[in-house]
């Protein structure tokens, strides 16, 4: 269930002028409560033998502080992996999020979390025209999939510069982790998935039917990621991808 701020934004966008206080009062009267995000849990498995000396550490601003923002879509991206329990075993989900719009521009799901999982997520972003033609920055944790020679070679071949945070430090990949928290509190924890297919379908519907297209995002002044992208394209006279 969405919180009162999200519901207020959605109602206002649909012409229903109402305050967050009023929405909160109505929710209390009806006994409706938003689902709270669960505590962050590290799922990274690093590879101490991986050669990462040429991969840059963090995405920092001119003051040396973490900077997970972007003004141009397709230039700065973040990615991570989470796991979803189903009746037929674990299903692993890798995502790629655009920092300019917070849109999930690529994702991949599989019964294992080997390197092709994360390559396929970035390949989806590339194939859908979501990577800037002059190159992009991709930030992740130090999971073995992201430090593998196969992934590093793929990034180099697609004009992607890798950045990485520290192992086990949640703030270093907070944007990606935040999306997973929303996915699980707003959708996943409401269902008991019998198999991979049912979970795959639900995840796809959540991402494209709700999160990207309709869910208000505070980073976009209340616009959904898709609407934020459209606003950028209209502002600069760009054709929709």
Question: What are the functions of these language-model segments?
Answer:
Residues 1-71, 169, 224-234:
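Basic, flexible linker segments flanking DNA-binding modules
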Residues 7, 23, 59, 80, ...:
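Mobile genetic element proteins and their domesticated derivatives, centered on retroelements
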Residues 44-46, 140-142, 148-151, 164-184, ...:
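RNase H-like two-metal-ion nuclease catalytic core shared by retroviral integrases
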Residues 61-105, 111:
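An active-site-proximal beta-strand-loop segment
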Residues 85, 89, 107-131:
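Active-site beta-loop-alpha junctions of metal-dependent nucleic acid enzymes
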Residues 101-107, 162-165, 189-190:
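Short small-residue beta-strand/loop micro-motif enriched in glycine and branched aliphatics
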Residues 156-160, 182-241:
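C-terminal domain-tail junction helix/linker
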């Amino acid at each position: 269930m969405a919180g009162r701020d999200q519901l207020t934004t959605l109602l206002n966008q649909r012409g229903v002028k109402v305050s967050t206080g009023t929405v909160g009062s109505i929710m209390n009267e009806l006994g409706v409560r938003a689902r709270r995000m669960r505590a962050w849990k590290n799922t990274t498995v690093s590879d101490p033998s991986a050669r990462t000396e040429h991969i840059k550490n963090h995405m920092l601003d001119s003051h040396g502080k973490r900077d997970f923002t972007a003004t141009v879509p397709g230039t700065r991206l973040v990615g991570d992996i989470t796991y979803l329990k189903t009746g037929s075993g674990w299903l692993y989900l890798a995502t790629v999020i655009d920092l300019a719009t917070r849109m999930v521009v690529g994702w991949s799901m599989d019964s294992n979390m080997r390197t092709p999982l994360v390559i396929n997520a970035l390949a989806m972003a590339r194939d859908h025209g979501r990577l800037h033609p002059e190159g992009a920055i991709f930030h992740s944790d130090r999971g073995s999939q992201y430090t593998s020679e196969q992934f590093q070679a793929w990034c180099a071949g697609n004009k992607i510069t890798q950045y990485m945070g520290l192992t086990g430090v949640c703030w270093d990949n907070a944007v990606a982790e935040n999306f997973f928290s929303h996915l699980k509190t707003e959708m996943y924890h409401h269902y008991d998935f019998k198999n991979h297919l049912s979970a795959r379908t639900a995840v796809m519907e959540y991402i494209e039917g709700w999160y990207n297209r309709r869910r208000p995002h505070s980073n976009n002044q209340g616009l959904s990621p898709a609407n934020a992208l459209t606003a950028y394209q209209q502002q600069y006279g760009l054709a929709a991808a």
